[in-house]
Amino acid sequence: MLKTVALAVPSLRRLYEGRNKLLIQLNAEITRSQELEDQLQQLTSEVAALRAIERSPFFAYYANFDALDTMRRHEVHNLVPTEGFQTNWLGVKVDPKIYPFLADSGGTLDPFPYPANWHADIAEWAAALQAVDNAPRDSFTMIELGCGWGCWMNNMGVAARRTGRKVHVIGVEGDEGHLQFAREALGRNSFGAHEYTLHHGIAAAASGTALFPRQERAGHSWGLEPVFGATEEQQVQAAASGSHDILPMISLADVIGPLGRIDLLHIDIQGGEAELVEGCLPLIKEKVAYMVIGTHSKHIEARLFDIMATTEWRIEMERPAFYQVTSTKPVLIVDGVQGWRNPALMNS
């Protein structure tokens, strides 16, 4: 009753209505303040995540070209997931069975590798794509030594094909299970039989016989190291124990064969990179336009610099191998990357 009487007085009614408006405004400001606080927390988390990414050692590369721009130009947008397979940023379909840690990745899209993904980092992706960009306009031919499941054959082959180039990709691999993965991956990513060649053996500077560790299940061990130039005694022991497969050492000259130009030579042979490059240097200088090399020690990195310093080749990408230094001896945890251009065969 008293409130009703009071509101009948114009001045009191205005005061009451003003109070209500202020309460509404206050509640709105409180809500907005909470929203701003939530946004601030989200931004703080995002900044922390970005700072963590920027501290990644995978940014410790040096290049004489814009690596990220090279990658962005090849990035495929509006990709659609494929059930049972992971699809990466280049549109390559990957079977999760090749690595146990990919078991739950079927039907997913793997994002742009900034600065890296499970397969490679900016340095290696960009260096390999640099070879694609500088290949002849109508063709792309590459060799992957130590091809595993055909990772670089598939990725660079798909990238080159998307530019309208005819492609031919060649791989050498010692593990038969991994070689079967490569056959399946190439077929899955629409490579015809005439567009690829696979060799079962060990890539080397010269022909011979090698021993390659045998594993019970393909995909569980990557980075197995062969025994080059196995003696008769070693071969007999390997055959008796079943520990190793006896495989041919396939020379780079035999892999290249009659081809006149190799646009990309990708070398990742678990420690034999420097020996192969040094032993095949005249052939490489004559026929290879670009090399991307996975380096498995500081010693190999230095040897490659010494070897290539005697040539006119130019290094375009360098990211050192990473070591864990918390133990008594440094332990290699990530291979290094070097990208080399042959001015005699590449556009300047």
Predicted segments with their positions:
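Phosphate/nucleotide-binding beta-alpha loop and adjacent structural elements of enzyme active sites
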Residues: 16, 23, 27-348
